[in-house]
Amino acid sequence: MDVDDLIYACRAADEELLDEIIEKCPQELSRRDENGNSGLHMASANGHIAVVQKIIPYLNKEVINAQNESGNTAMHWAALNGHAEICKLLLEAGGDPHIKNIYEKSPIYEADIRNQQKVMDLFLDFEIAKGSEENTGDEEKLEDGI
């Protein structure tokens, strides 16, 4: 198997080929093509939720946030194409919506300029929840008089 098989399987949602790759050599899921795109980039760009769900458990945070030669992450592609469910999966796996590409555009920006409202709502909810978690610790400290 080579990286082209992985890219094809993820771009075309060929789950049979993807299962074969996972069974024979799951470490291949981290590989990237000559443009820096991974299978996760392809599946995210094309809205293949089942593929993203299948491969995320094999990927670490570094791979989930990997940038291609244009600086785009899988989150950039999912956001600009309006794939909110994929953005949610990426966020839950440690994806960072603030990473900027070489044009200084983040996934949040890409979703906003393309009027991807579901994605924007998801990012807003994520930021609010993240802020709440951070503030909860501060509130407890305040209550304890620290």
From Swiss-Prot:
Source organism, top-level taxon: Eukaryota
ANK repeats: 1-31, 35-64, 70-99, 103-132
SUPFAM superfamilies assigned: Ankyrin repeat
Keyword Nucleus: yes
InterPro entries reported in the protein's UniProt record: Ankyrin_rpt, Ankyrin_rpt-contain_sf
Cellular compartments annotated: Cytoplasm; Nucleus
Organism annotation: Schizosaccharomyces pombe (strain 972 / ATCC 24843)
GO biological process: ribosome biogenesis
Gene3D superfamilies xref list: Ankyrin repeat-containing domain (1.25.40.20)
UniProt name for this protein: Ankyrin repeat-containing protein P16F5.05c
Chief location category: cytoplasm
Cellular compartments per GO CC: cytosol; nucleus; preribosome, small subunit precursor
Keyword line: ANK repeat, Cytoplasm, Nucleus, Repeat
